Amino acid sequence: MKKRIIILGGVVLAVVVLWSAAWLVLSGVVRQQIALQAEADGLTSPQLTCGTLTIGGFPFRFDADCSSARIVSGDAVIELPGLRASVLVYAPTHLLASALGPMQVTDTFTGSRNQLAWSALAASIRLADWRIARASISGENLVWSDTLLGSSTIAQTPLAELHLFDIPEQHDPTRQTAALAGYLRSSELAYPGLTLSDTNAELQLELTGLPDDVRNWGAPDMLPALQAANGQLNVVSIHGTDATSTLDASGALALDAQGQLEGQITITSTGVAERIGPLLEEPWRTLVLGAPGPDGSFANQLNFRDGAILSGLVPIAAIGPLF
């Protein structure tokens, strides 16, 4: 009996040692992959640098903690006190992330400086067969401020969340395309510039014709492939309301063979035209929101075709091809 216990103990010890060695090797790979982001050019791919990078979570997780994080993408420079990403060893396709605020955002081209603060900010993404099964990000007590000269609050909300869901019935293995449904919600939003307070907003979207492998997202031919697959952005619903105003919109947009947007967006509103008067003067306000009806509500349809945005048949803006 004693000999069996010794053998069992030896086996357990060997497993622990082997697993510890494997974890150390894998943690080194994780560290190396994150460190490689510091060598990106910040143009074709974002550059991430960490003041301090630590990998923890032994034995069943990999927790990557990046303090004093700095992200460069084009003209935008983003700085955060800390970022954390975690993956369970037995569920490597499920990533959890969180961030410490506030986040400083600088545009090196325009010189603008903004800050986004929060009390909690967390995200998760789960993959299934390299498709996004679900992705979410949620923030609490968000405050967006202009910090170029002092600090001026632009907008704030106690809760904002974004969710993406796979639409399994629209997955086409033959054409290698997938579809995502998106849901964005913000509650009790305050935007002093538009005299908005206690505003609730919801956005529901569906995007079809996406590559069914996220590793192919961002490829140079992604948009042409989406167009060839008859991909479409369905604006299922945009709904915003506060004590005196409502705004609703829906429609669909796609790409034509030249990479130009085509489709329609229908907008109905009450109390919005008066609210955005200082930002959108006539005749543009009427061209976007439409003329008031007998009940005081506004309705209009924006058409997208041949590289133009039209209010009815009147061109109001131009959009270049997307590919």
List where the protein language model places each region.
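Flexible, membrane-facing loop/turn or short amphipathic-helix motifs
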Residues: 68-77, 103-115, 141-155, 171, ...
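Extended lipid/amphipathic-ligand handling interfaces
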Residues: 53-55, 80-91, 116-131, 152-174, ...
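Short, hydrophobic/aromatic-rich segments at coil-to-beta transitions
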Residues: 63, 94-95, 133-136, 177-183, ...
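Hydrophobic membrane-insertion alpha-helices, especially the h-region
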Residues: 6-23
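Extended terminal
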Residues: 2-10, 51-52, 221-228, 238-241, ...
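N-terminal beta-strand/beta-hairpin edge segment
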Residues: 43-172, 187
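Alpha-helical transmembrane signal-anchor/signal-peptide segments
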Residues: 25-44
